[in-house]
């Protein structure tokens, strides 16, 4: 696993070097099935299905030569004006974990209530770094694809579909444009004035925050491609 490590100078020319010092473990399963369910003189149907699942683990971030004392790395970036890392990867943990404050409610003044390190409610104004926790994972646990090909006389039809399941996404547009404080900075989504947790809208002085409220399920199933053809004879 590649990461930037602090090194001594000399012998190295620079104080930081990109090195492949980490160790990653992946365990998974892939299944592929194909069949011709129907085949006659004028009509045929060929189908294939693929399924895969994978579980990863960051075994180590350091080796004998390159050391990372923290035991974790932070990656992803919200950008201005929030300016926070979105992911933290621990030794012994999974890659792709969203790491931040877990919102559990909103108070009567429209300010977030988060869960502290012990699982108790706390106003977000009293947030501490140790209150952050894993709030989702952006890597799909299940990947599927289904391809179908049909022929009828000189006509042919192909349909390709795929899906990904059991993973999360960070909804950036909502995180930035669903907070009334942004009205003085630009546009807002219509949902900015919808009650949060069924109670009240966000306070127009509530600063933009990277919190679990904007983490959503990313599950999808879509048609990637449809082709129709005719063969001249």
Language-model features: locations:
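Membrane-embedded beta-barrel scaffold of Gram-negative outer-membrane proteins
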Residues: 1-12, 45, 50-52
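Outer-membrane beta-barrel and related beta-rich outer-membrane complex signature
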Residues: 2-6, 56-72, 76, 167-191, ...
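Flexible, solvent-exposed coil segments and beta strand-coil junctions
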Residues: 5-16, 120-130, 200-212
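Transmembrane beta-barrel architecture of outer-membrane proteins
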Residues: 16, 26-30, 44, 141-145, ...
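Conserved small-residue
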Residues: 19-25, 29, 36-137
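Transmembrane beta-strands of outer-membrane beta-barrel pores
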Residues: 25, 35-37, 51-57, 152-154, ...
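Repeated loop/turn-to-beta-strand initiation elements of outer-membrane beta-barrel proteins
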Residues: 41, 154-159
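Extracytoplasmic gating/loop element in the C-terminal half of outer-membrane beta-barrel translocons
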Residues: 164-233
